[in-house]
């Protein structure tokens, strides 16, 4: 790749996943749209690497190297083949596709769907795909939330390789949280997984991710009480009293509390 392509790719890959399109739009302006093919190619590689879902016939589908077929991608459970519009993140040129799935793969996918629906409240998707290496299956979960009015975005991606024959589960979990109100704070963490003697990979994933989520909650709480506390602006000392009893409704905090916000 050229130096220009390297820089473009790095900027897109470093962006919080739910804000990639905003970064792309800015890059189009900065580069004066002189090399749109390079930008689109980098955007597509970024979407695939981060497993960001594509809307295919009204439901999310994850595109990866495992379900690539020529210039298109297929969903083995929807039985469709499609191309990708990277900007709008939708599937185009959709056509029927007979993808072979095993009963065990379908069983894992059904269990995974139930787990994701119950535990990931954001924009979520999951899949189970053969890796092409013996009996190995890639188990992928991705979920994200974006609240621009509250100046934050969040992203979770967990990806595992499970071998039914060896009963091994390896993988990695990536979590990114971005706060950008009057500042710019990005929290990024990775957890690597390596487990053996696993007969039920979905139950194992459920337990692992619950433990990791608890650890993240504790880390955020500690961070909020230490490093974040140092960043907060200290309020000025006015040496005047606030009549909370009679005038609380005049203050924004009181109004929000009264309205249940």
Curated annotation (Swiss-Prot):
It holds the Pfam family F-actin_cap_A. One of its GO terms (cellular component) is mitotic actomyosin contractile ring. SUPFAM superfamilies: Subunits of heterodimeric actin filament capping protein Capz. PROSITE patterns: F_ACTIN_CAPPING_A_1. InterPro entries: CapZ_alpha, CapZ_alpha/beta, CapZ_alpha/beta_2, CapZ_alpha_1, F-actin_cap_asu_CS. Keywords: Actin capping, Actin-binding. Coiled coil: none annotated. GO terms for molecular function: actin filament binding. GO terms for biological process: actin cytoskeleton organization; barbed-end actin filament capping. Heterodimer of an alpha and a beta subunit. Belongs to the F-actin-capping protein alpha subunit family. F-actin-capping proteins bind in a Ca(2+)-independent manner to the fast growing ends of actin filaments (barbed end) thereby blocking the exchange of subunits at these ends. Unlike other capping proteins (such as gelsolin and severin), these proteins do not sever actin filaments. This is F-actin-capping protein subunit alpha. The lineage of its organism: Eukaryota, Fungi, Dikarya, Ascomycota, Saccharomycotina.
């Amino acid at each position: 790749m050229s130096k220009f392509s390297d820089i473009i790719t790095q900027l897109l890959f470093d962006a919080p996943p739910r804000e990639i399109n905003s970064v792309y739009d800015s890059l189009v302006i900065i580069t004066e749209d002189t090399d749109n093919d390079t930008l689109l190619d980098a955007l597509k590689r970024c979407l695939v690497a981060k497993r960001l879902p594509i809307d295919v016939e009204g439901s999310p589908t994850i595109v990866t190297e495992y379900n690539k077929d020529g210039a298109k991608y297929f969903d083995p459970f929807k039985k469709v083949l499609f191309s990708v519009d990277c900007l709008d993140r939708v599937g185009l040129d959709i056509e029927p596709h007979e993808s072979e799935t095993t009963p065990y793969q379908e069983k894992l996918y059904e269990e995974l769907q139930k787990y994701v629906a119950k535990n990931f409240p954001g924009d979520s998707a999951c899949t189970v795909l053969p890796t092409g290496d013996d009996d190995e299956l890639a188990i992928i979960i991705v979920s994200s939330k974006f609240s621009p009015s509250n100046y934050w975005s969040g992203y979770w991606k967990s990806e595992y390789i499970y071998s039914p024959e060896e009963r091994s589960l390896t993988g990695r979990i990536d979590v990114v949280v971005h706060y950008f109100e009057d500042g710019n704070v990005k929290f990024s963490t990775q957890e690597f997984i390596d487990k053996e003697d696993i007969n039920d990979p979905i139950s194992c994933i459920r337990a692992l991710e619950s433990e990791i989520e608890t650890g993240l909650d504790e880390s955020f709480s500690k961070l909020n009480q230490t490093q974040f506390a140092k960043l907060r602006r200290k309020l000025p000392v006015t040496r005047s009293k606030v009549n909370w009893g009679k005038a609380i409704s005049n203050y924004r905090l009181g109004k929000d509390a009264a309205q249940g916000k």
